[in-house]
Amino acid sequence: MALETFVNSEPFTFGVELEIQIVNTHNYDLTKAASDLMRLIKDAKFPGNITPEITESMIELSTGICRTHDQALGELHAIRDTLVNAADQLNVGLCGGGTHAFQQWSERQIFDAPRFQYISELYGYLAKQFTVFGQHVHIGCPDADSALFLLHSMSRFIPHFIALSASSPYVQNVDTGFHSARLNSVFAFPLSGRAPFVLTWSGFEEYFTKMVNTGVVNSMKDFYWDIRPKPGYGTIEVRVMDTPLSVDRAAAIACYIQTLARYLLIDRPLKLSEDDYLVYTFNRFEACRFGLEGTCVNPQTGERRTIAEDILDTLDRIAPHAAALGSRAALDEIGALAKARVNDASWLRTIFKQEKSLNETVRQQCLRWRE
């Protein structure tokens, strides 16, 4: 199969995708209701889209093409409200969070769609264990080579996105010690991690053709990279974030990525090199394990600082671009998180410490999702 032609798109437009948990309102375990939710909302009017995901206990909402923070917020609130109204009719709850705190993966049911059934057959139990919930952000790129430049430039900031969105400290009744345990599930897939260091679209087409010829991949969907190009949309897709506990947080993170993209493509502050990836896995682990308190190492200078400090320094650098995009309010929220060194994983641990119950913690996640 040939690689799709890269469709040039309006630079720095963006779209947000959020995978959402569906829980019962008895003990707040995951429940099977995606098909019923899809039936209830099929005639509803809302921006963006709502689609099923790999198991019946999750559903995905996505915005349309956004240009500003206000637009993204408005669309996310409207789609969220549509889903919440449908969930109320079914007496089920919806919430964010990168993992469900105590669900048993073996109880999950694969959604009845050809691709999901194929993934289940190919990956076995990993497919059910993949009942984890992420935020993806698409960024519009003017051309294919710019997309690859942005992809590799943005990779330096992967720890920021992980630490800011982290909301998965609990897995199967256990505090994992991680801020984002979700990404450990993604890493189990053979084509996960980071994209190959290729800076021209012709070079990327050559790589893709070689991979297809091995029989390992059929399409771009088979790559579970942290950031991957989406040629049919004319975007790159940042895929490392946990689903935040609120749509407001999701919009703020998306606009941080949008503003950073404008800075990286217009100012071109980075000279890209394969050596940029020497500390990639280390920095990624630090963000997953320790959140905003984690250490990140600059691959070119060897300088070490906390992820929170690196975010605050980055916010200063990209401030002029925030003014141009109207994303100052979003970046103020990001700055407040970095200064306080708190994220949704911190919030979940605080609630559990108060309530001594993961069931109650998930119930409060559902309340937070409606705010």
Curated annotation (Swiss-Prot):
Top class in the EC scheme: ligase
Domain of life: Bacteria
Reaction(s) catalysed (UniProt annotation): L-cysteine + L-glutamate + ATP = gamma-L-glutamyl-L-cysteine + ADP + phosphate + H(+)
SUPFAM superfamilies reported for this sequence: Glutamine synthetase/guanido kinase
Enzyme Commission code: 6.3.2.2
GO molecular function: ATP binding; glutamate-cysteine ligase activity
Pfam families (UniProt xref): GCS2
GO biological process, one term: modified amino acid biosynthetic process
Keyword tags: ATP-binding, Ligase, Nucleotide-binding
InterPro entries, A to Z: GCL_type2/YbdK_subfam (IPR050141), GCS2 (IPR006336), Gln_synth/guanido_kin_cat_dom (IPR014746), YbdK (IPR011793)
Record-stated family: Belongs to the glutamate--cysteine ligase type 2 family. YbdK subfamily.
Main function: ATP-dependent carboxylate-amine ligase which exhibits weak glutamate--cysteine ligase activity.
Name of the featured protein: Putative glutamate--cysteine ligase 2
Organism: Burkholderia thailandensis (strain ATCC 700388 / DSM 13276 / CCUG 48851 / CIP 106301 / E264)
